[in-house]
Design a protein with these regions (language model features):
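Alpha/beta enzyme core
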Residues: 1-134
Length: 134
């Protein structure tokens, strides 16, 4: 991937932009504006954007759990769906959380995705004020 800006083209649930046409339009505008890649959520969006842009697509699937926590591509199942949709890269969660996967589990998930897909993997990590997790 070239050096430059990567634009995340996503819309929250309930947003009037949360539809394939809007996500494709956002990605095309990001490319027109000079983005070197776009970050796209959801298999249908990934597939549609891949057909319309000539820059790399970083694919992810957000899974919201009953705890309210959101995980980015939390398992090989989602990673395989992203790969099949044509993403150039897979973004996967490696964030440690007390109530879910540990950092070690996150890294294992990343390794598994790397080994079982043919697409480069980008680790998504975020930490709040309660770091370090024990």
């Amino acid at each position: 991937m070239d050096k430059g800006i990567i634009v995340s083209c996503q819309a929250e649930e309930g947003s009037y932009l949360n539809n394939i046409q809007s996500i494709v339009a956002l990605a095309k505008e990001a490319e027109r504006g000079g983005a070197v890649a776009v970050r796209i959520e959801g298999v249908d969006n990934i597939s549609a954007v891949k057909k319309e842009v000539d820059i790399p697509v970083i694919g992810l699937i957000k899974k919201k759990y009953t705890t309210g926590k959101v995980w980015i591509t939390p398992s090989i199942l989602e990673a395989k769906l992203i790969e099949a949709a044509g993403a150039d890269y897979i973004a996967a969660d490696a964030t440690g959380r007390k109530d879910a996967l540990t950092v070690k589990d996150g890294w294992k998930n990343l390794r598994d995705i790397c080994e079982l897909t043919s697409v480069p993997v980008i680790g998504d990590m975020a930490y709040g004020l309660s770091w370090p997790y024990e």
